[in-house]
């Protein structure tokens, strides 16, 4: 029986942000409550059945390094694994995996239900309890009150959600799931700026009605990639391929002819959709010079008959969707199992949040995921973990933590959101990170595991693996440095012939890794340099450090310069009118955004270098006068 109870932290929502937040809090030994509308949809992949991709996989690996569940779950449910940008540099290489929807959700759900310190309840939250601008708890639809020191709100697309299919409109945050109307109205009464965004999904297709013989096939990579730093290939289920087709002029003509029937173009939807995942209607209007748009036919699971046609998200009427699908090669007789639709929902301006994802105006109230204006499972999971760990720290009366832009893609994500805000669904890309050579997906554990350990976010097995990897890197680096290439020890002619290179001066085996044609594996083929280590993750780090040594040093220097301003805290300035010389516009923006540091202030639109100089002078005067 549900009754009033007290908790350290309450999580509202069981999506990717909510599950990571709940697990982070419970691992940090906090009495945690997760409230979700439907226990059966915990960890559901609401849109495409995939995890990772360009920039997104970096977030997944960082979540994993901080003890999160997403990478482990996809390793156990991924049915096609690939490395994107594999022919490019390590900084932009990204892992992506197709997921078996049911397996993925089951893995997440099982982890939560067996997690110590965590109670999962099925209940809809209608209200939050706020007293003197401090969060006190939540109230469910059935009027039960749950009290806590902190609340993490992760409502996804359910806050005031409306679903559109052609001219039809009905309430929902996902097809067949109710939207949160009362909670949406309650948030409008709080000091939170609310906006509207839109997302969408394509129709699903019965795989038995597709002519795959006409289509290109895309298989998993060999060897199979792994997401979690604690994972292995044996965890992967059976692998199956995806297929590729494309729209054509006939498809485009059908869409153009029916544009007025799309709620996006009829004026029914006012929310802005994702720029980097546009609907097929938007693609055909915005890219009118293109005569085809690629479509990836992605299986929804090993034993699922449904196919997800990635690339044709739409909210056109159902009859138009059928006509459109039948115009595409291989889908001439395809049967739609459920139509595509658009969802319009409320989001909160993330500029009203601290970098810890706590509200600047309501103490102990944290927001994470799509409610902050992002799109994507990975962005949500990363925010959820950060909000969860900070809610736990808050509940313990400890200072919050957040990574900087030179420390993690998560740092880039929250700095972009909380400093610049967003007017459209925000998606992570490697291009958003100015220090991406440092922030590779392969070294996320080296960047963040020790921090996770300090906050009790990880178990002993992960820490042991981390220490072992560091030791392997250090010892093997030292060994390669000590393998001197001198004429007395090695025949330089022998080396030159073996590697097809020209060495004229004395060097080391480690120096040879700087050459583009030599990697660690080929280096170990030279008997006098072998045997090497078997730890692939460790020797890849050695190789990367050598090949990009000069670039990495320059980026580290740039990060240090940037951090100089990020370490100058502004939180003691309550009203910027006291700083003489600032324009009214600058004062207004600084008072509204309340930047944490001088570095964050410098990244706010409209804050000039001159204003930053004035602030720096003011702070120095205050320092010397005390």
Curated annotation (Swiss-Prot):
Compartments (UniProt record): Cytoplasm
GO BP annotation list: tRNA methylation; tRNA wobble uridine modification
Annotated PROSITE patterns: GIDA_1, GIDA_2
Primary subcellular site in the record, as a coarse category: cytoplasm
Residue numbers binding NAD(+): 273-287
Pfam families from the UniProt entry: GIDA, GIDA_C_1st, SAM_GIDA_C
Residues that bind FAD: 13-18, 125, 180, 370
Cofactor(s) required, per the database record: FAD
Molecular-function GO terms, alphabetical: flavin adenine dinucleotide binding
Gene Ontology CC entries for this record: cytosol
Alphabetical UniProt keywords: Cytoplasm, FAD, Flavoprotein, NAD, tRNA processing
Family of the protein in this entry: Belongs to the MnmG family.
Role, per record: NAD-binding protein involved in the addition of a carboxymethylaminomethyl (cmnm) group at the wobble position (U34) of certain tRNAs, forming tRNA-cmnm(5)s(2)U34.
Subunit structure: Homodimer. Heterotetramer of two MnmE and two MnmG subunits.
Protein name stated in the entry: tRNA uridine 5-carboxymethylaminomethyl modification enzyme MnmG
Protein's organism: Buchnera aphidicola subsp. Baizongia pistaciae (strain Bp)
Lineage of the species this protein comes from: Bacteria, Pseudomonadati, Pseudomonadota, Gammaproteobacteria, Enterobacterales
This protein's encoding gene: mnmG
């Amino acid at each position: 029986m549900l009754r009033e109870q007290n908790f350290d932290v309450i999580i509202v929502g069981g999506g990717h942000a909510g599950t990571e937040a709940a697990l982070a809090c419970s691992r940090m030994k906090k009495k945690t409550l997760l409230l979700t509308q439907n226990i059966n949809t915990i960890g559901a992949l609401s849109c495409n059945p995939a995890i990772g991709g360009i920039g997104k996989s970096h977030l997944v690996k960082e979540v994993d390094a901080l003890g999160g569940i997403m990478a482990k779950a996809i390793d156990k449910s991924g049915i096609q694994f690939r490395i994107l940008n594999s022919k490019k540099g390590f900084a932009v290489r990204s892992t992506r995996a197709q997921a078996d929807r049911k397996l993925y959700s089951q893995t997440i759900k099982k982890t939560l239900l067996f997690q110590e310190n965590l109670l999962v309840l099925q209940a809809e939250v209608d209200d939050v309890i706020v007293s003197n601008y401090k969060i006190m708890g939540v109230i469910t639809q059935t009027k039960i009150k749950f009290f806590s020191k902190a609340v993490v709100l992760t409502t996804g697309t359910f806050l005031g959600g409306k679903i559109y299919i052609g001219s039809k409109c009905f309430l929902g945050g996902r097809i067949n799931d109710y939207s949160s109307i009362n909670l949406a109205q309650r948030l409008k009464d709080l000091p939170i700026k609310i906006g509207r965004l839109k997302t969408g999904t394509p129709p699903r297709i019965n795989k038995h009605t597709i002519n795959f013989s006409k289509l290109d096939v895309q298989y998993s990579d060999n060897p199979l990639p792994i997401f979690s730093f604690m994972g292995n290939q044996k965890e992967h289920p059976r692998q199956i391929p995806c297929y590729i087709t494309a729209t054509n002029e006939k498809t485009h003509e059908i869409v153009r002819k029916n544009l007025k029937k799309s709620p996006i173009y009829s004026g029914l939807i006012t929310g802005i959709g994702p720029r980097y995942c546009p609907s097929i209607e938007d693609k055909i209007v915005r890219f009118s010079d293109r005569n085809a748009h690629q479509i990836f036919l992605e299986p929804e699971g090993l034993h699922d008959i449904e196919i997800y046609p990635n690339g044709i998200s739409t909210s056109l009427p159902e009859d138009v969707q059928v006509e459109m699908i039948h115009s595409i090669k291989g889908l001439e007789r395809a049967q739609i199992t459920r139509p595509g639709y658009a969802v319009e929902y409320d989001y909160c301006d993330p500029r009203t949040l601290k970098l810890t994802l706590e509200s600047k105006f309501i103490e102990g109230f944290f927001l994470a995921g799509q409610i902050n204006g992002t799109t994507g499972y990975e962005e949500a999971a990363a925010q959820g973990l950060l909000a969860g760990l900070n809610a736990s720290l808050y509940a313990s009366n400890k200072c919050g933590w957040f990574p900087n832009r030179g420390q993690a893609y998560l740092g880039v994500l929250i700095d972009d959101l909380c400093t610049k805000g967003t007017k459209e669904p925000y998606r992570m890309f490697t291009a958003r990170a100015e220090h991406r050579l440092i922030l590779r997906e392969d070294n996320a554990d080296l960047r963040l595991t020790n921090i996770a350990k300090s906050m009790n976010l990880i178990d002993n097995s992960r820490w042991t693996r981390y220490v072992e990897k560091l030791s392997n890197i250090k010892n093997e680096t030292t060994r390669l440095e000590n393998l001197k290439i001198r004429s007395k020890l090695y025949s330089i002619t022998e080396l030159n012939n073996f590697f097809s290179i020209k060495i004229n001066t004395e060097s080391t085996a480690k120096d040879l890794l700087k050459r583009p044609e030599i990697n660690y594996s080929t280096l170990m083929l030279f008997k006098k340099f072998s045997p090497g280590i078997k730890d692939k993750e460790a020797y890849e780090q050695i190789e990367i450090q050598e090949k990009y040594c000069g670039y990495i040093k320059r980026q580290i220097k740039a990060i240090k310069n940037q951090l100089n301003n990020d370490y100058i805290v502004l939180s003691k300035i309550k009203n910027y009118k006291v700083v003489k010389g600032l324009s009214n516009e600058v004062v207004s923006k600084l008072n509204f955004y309340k930047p944490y540091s001088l570095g964050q202030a410098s990244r706010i639109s409209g804050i000039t270098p001159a204003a930053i100089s004035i602030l720096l002078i003011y702070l120095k005067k205050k320092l010397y006068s005390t």
